[in-house]
Structure formats: structure tokens, C-alpha cells
Amino acid sequence: KIDPFGFREYDARWLYPENINLEGVANLGKGLGTQVIKHTNKKNPRIIVGHDYRSYSEEIKAALKKGLISTGCYIEDIGLSLSPMVYFAQFNLDSDAVAMVTASHNENGWTGVKMGIKKGLTHAPEEMQELKDITLNSKFVEGEGSEKEISNFQSIYKDDLINKNKIQKKIKAVVACGNGTAGIFAPDILRGIGCEVIELD
């Protein structure tokens, strides 16, 4: 099950499981994998995959990876992530594409995927339309992919931000991340650059 209206201009979002189920997510992975293979002209492109803090995001990610792997993609899973961290990983690990399982600021109950192929760029409307066509019409390629976990990438991302952003004058930062994924990252990073941090939630 996959609702066509979930394909938006720059990313994809659905209510889960009302508008998309795990089989639908796997088909999205097949569609994205097929698209990446077409655009990179590689049989086994490397794709960075991450997920946000929602309780069901890991099962969504597992289904997405299953679809990607079935097309021949090599997955590099960086685990719990922020969207900018996934884009950073594409440069840091020199991969071919990214797929971030998140519904951004949408409330709980939503899921989605932010995607990009060219470094520093997310899918544009024409790429989303192409992905929609491939996915809904099952125009999938088949291949033999693989996956590996990049277990320490949170630390790599935090250290990069901290080392580039030291402050001279100590300031007090009140951090309210609204129970979002940023709560795993922001306090540590702000302390690392020299702030006194007060965490609210």
C-alpha cells in the first residue's frame, strides 16, 4: 500500500500505517534504488541511510533498505541521525546518494523519506515525479546489494561541528528540542563549543 499523494515536490511523507505499509516502503526503496542506479550509471551505488527518533522509524528504515538492496545498492547505515548529518555523511564517506527516514516537523504518526543523489542536493520536483512513476508502476531493476553499519558516525558528526565552531565568550544556551532527534545532538555540540547548556526537554 502506498498513497500517490505522499510524493511531494521535494520529499515524500505519509501517515503510517494508514497511507503506506512496510511493503509500500520497500517498493519506495526499489524505486529509489532504480533511480539512483540510472542517474549514477553504477551497478552498485553506495547509499547513506539514516533515521529519526520516531518509535517506528527503524522498521520503516529496514523496509526501505530491503528495497534498496534488492536493486543492487550498497547501504551504509549511520543509524539515528539528523537530516543535515546524512548530507554531511555523503561528503564525508563519499557516497553516491542519501535516504533519510523522517517526516521532519510533522507530528507523530507521520513518516517519510528525504532523498538526494548529487552531493548537497535533495530531490527536485522532476526527480520526485520520476521516482513516483518508477515506484507506482513497478519499473524496478534487480540486483544484489549489501549493507553495513557505520557505528560511530554520531561522534564523527559532533566532533566536526565542535572543532570548527569554538566560541571565545561563554554563553548560556537554553535548549528545548521538543522531544525531537536534535535532543540527542544539540546539547553535546553546544557544550563542546563552549556553551553552558540548560536542557528543557
State where each predicted segment sits.
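Active-site flanking residues adjacent to catalytic metal/cofactor-binding acidic residues
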Residues: 10, 51, 101, 175-178, ...
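Alpha-helix N-cap/helix-start motif
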Residues: 25, 57-61, 109, 124-125, ...
